[in-house]
């Protein structure tokens, strides 16, 4: 039996690739409608073509950092277009691989904007009953195990993910009395376009052999994200769930 119906409308960011793509496709497979957001519209439309029910995969082309100062206005415009939302999965993100000594302020701010401020502003705004369905609404953000693994060269990236975990756990406590839930999922190494590019070779070298089950696939994470968005996890909120294979 499907987890959702077409009355359940979800927002998924970063839906054109990686974990966001598999989350969006899985939600549609489980019966929901998905407003899929990404900066690359061409890639997003190609994902729609893969969908089992393309009519339930709704494409929105946006750079979320451009809406930081008025996230409320942006989400209200989506609600007016599609209706109230049952949940949101924030899967958009970027990585910055540099030693701390070479890291510049501006690039650090840019990374915090997409990895921290955008999800925090989006999720705290989403929890407005004028935008979400109220009690039972669920938000999940993809963080990272790097928040506590603290690999060399990932100073700012690790900081964005640790901050995200902490802030969303706080928001979860604030919205729990209204029956709303907020969680994060922190994967270790997953084979996505972001983590498997040439810039990440120095991190990956010799690392996969330390993974008892090898590097994960995006689908290994999306199953957990979809579970946390569903009513099957109705008692779970305010926590970070590690997606890993006994690596640490």
Which functions belong to the PLM regions below?
Residues 16-17:
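Conserved glycine-rich cofactor-binding loop
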């Amino acid at each position: 039996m499907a987890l959702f119906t077409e009355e359940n409308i979800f927002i998924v960011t970063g839906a054109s690739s990686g974990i966001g793509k598999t989350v969006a496709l899985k939600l549609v497979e489980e019966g929901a409608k998905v407003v899929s957001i990404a900066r690359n519209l061409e890639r997003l439309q190609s994902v729609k073509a893969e969908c089992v029910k393309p009519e339930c995969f709704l494409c929105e082309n946006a750079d979320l950092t451009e809406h930081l100062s008025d996230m409320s206005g942006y989400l209200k415009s989506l609600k007016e277009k599609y209706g109230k939302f049952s949940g949101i999965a924030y899967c958009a993100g970027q990585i910055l691989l540099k030693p701390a000594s070479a890291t510049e302020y501006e690039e650090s701010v840019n990374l915090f904007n997409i990895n921290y401020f955008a999800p925090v502003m989006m999720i705290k705004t989403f929890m407005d009953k004028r935008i979400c369905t109220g009690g039972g609404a669920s938000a999940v953000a993809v963080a990272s195990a790097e928040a506590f693994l603290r690999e060399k060269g990932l100073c700012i990236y690790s900081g964005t993910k640790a901050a995200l975990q902490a802030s969303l756990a706080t928001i979860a406590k604030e919205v729990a009395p209204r029956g709303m839930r907020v969680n994060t999922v922190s994967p270790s190494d997953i084979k996505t376009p972001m983590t498997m590019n040439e810039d990440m070779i120095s991190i990956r070298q010799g690392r996969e052999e330390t993974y008892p089950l090898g590097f994960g696939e995006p689908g290994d994470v999306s199953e957990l994200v979809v579970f946390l968005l569903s009513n099957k996890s109705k008692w779970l909120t305010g926590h970070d769930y590690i997606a890993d294979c006994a690596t640490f």
